[in-house]
Amino acid sequence: MSIDWFTFTAQVINFLVLVGLLRYFLYAPIVRAMQAREQKVTQCLTDAETAKVEANQQRMSLEKQTQLLQERREELLTKAKADADNERQRLIAEARKEADTRREHWTSTFERDQKDLADQTRRDIQRMGFQAARETVQQLADEDLQKRVCQTFVKQLQTLGEDQLAAIATQLADSGNPVLVRSAKGLDSSDQNQIRDAIHRVFENKVEVRFESEPALIAGIEMDAGGYSLPWNAERTLKTMEANVA
């Protein structure tokens, strides 16, 4: 069997041309498309991995933030509870202090009011007692009592010391006023003469003596000599007693 080298060569050339054409027009675009697709897939995979890494990082960041928030929340809750307890204790202490202050104030006010009431009651009782004593003495004051009062006054006058008498005499001389004798009731002539004579004996001169009635003296006599007062009466005694018990 003989070979037609021309035909063989032509077929080889045609095959090579066909391969070249296929490679240029068909295989090259397919390869480029496959490479582009591969690059795109690779890029997608890379992007996906990057997104996965970023997602993991975000997840970890969120978890960390969540943990921090939880810790902060617990810290805030603990602090808020402690602050609330402290405030409650402070309010309770203030309420107790206020209650104690009010109780002490009320107790003090009550005790003071009780004392004031007791003092006022005591003063009222004393006042009524002394008023009753005045009225009783006034009712019991008769002529015999008046004479005894005059006698007692004369004795009291005679017990004055020399210094007192000299001072009274000087005041009488300087003032030029008469000796004024006041009595709860008007003195009869004998009582007036008794007192006048006693005054003249004491002062050793004829000083003028005047007599006046003063019901407020209550069974007593009072002498005013140039500004010097010599009292002897129940009213003075009662006032002294009132001052002592006030």
From Swiss-Prot:
GO CC, alphabetical: plasma membrane; proton-transporting ATP synthase complex
Bilayer topology term: Single-pass membrane protein
Record keywords: ATP synthesis, Cell inner membrane, Cell membrane, CF(0), Hydrogen ion transport, Ion transport, Membrane, Transmembrane, Transmembrane helix, Transport
Disulfide bond positions: none
Transmembrane spans: 5-27
Quaternary state and interactors: F-type ATPases have 2 components, F(1) - the catalytic core - and F(0) - the membrane proton channel. F(1) has five subunits: alpha(3), beta(3), gamma(1), delta(1), epsilon(1). F(0) has three main subunits: a(1), b(2) and c(10-14). The alpha and beta chains form an alternating ring which encloses part of the gamma chain. F(1) is attached to F(0) by a central stalk formed by the gamma and epsilon chains, while a peripheral stalk is formed by the delta and b chains.
Family in the record: Belongs to the ATPase B chain family.
Function per UniProt: F(1)F(0) ATP synthase produces ATP from ADP in the presence of a proton or sodium gradient. F-type ATPases consist of two structural domains, F(1) containing the extramembraneous catalytic core and F(0) containing the membrane proton channel, linked together by a central stalk and a peripheral stalk. During catalysis, ATP synthesis in the catalytic domain of F(1) is coupled via a rotary mechanism of the central stalk subunits to proton translocation. Component of the F(0) channel, it forms part of the peripheral stalk, linking F(1) to F(0).
This protein's name: ATP synthase subunit b 1
Gene: atpF1
